[in-house]
Amino acid sequence: MKLIMKTKFKTGQYICIKWRPVESLIPTPLGFMYSSKNESTYGVWKIEPYKFGGIDYKMRLVPVGESAKIFFPMDRYTSDYSDLPDEMIFDDQSLAEKFVKEFLID
């Protein structure tokens, strides 16, 4: 997996991206695993600094608001979102949530 190193946004901002919602939690001896739905949907994610096990991942995506009910945080992910349009990057959570509701979700 590729870690985010260079982005056009910074921690504390909110981005609107498409991801697969959690379908169910599966208990395991090491904690929980989850299965995802096959269809992706848009959500609002806050960009937070993240360091774990001595590895600096630069940032972590944490779902907020309504998105927190259907998504799990992403510590590692495969895209740097460098092609994310500026219109999908917000400094205010309520504006990001309004944008998703009005323009991205049917």
Residue ranges and their predicted role:
Residues 1-14:
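Mixed-charge, Lys/Arg-rich low-complexity intrinsically disordered regions
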Residues 7, 29, 34-37, 65, ...:
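Generic low-complexity, intrinsically disordered sequence content enriched
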Residues 8, 25, 36-37, 41-42, ...:
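Compositionally biased regions
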Residues 22-59:
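Short beta-strand-centered aromatic/proline hotspots
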Residues 53-106:
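Intrinsically disordered, low-complexity, charged/polar segments
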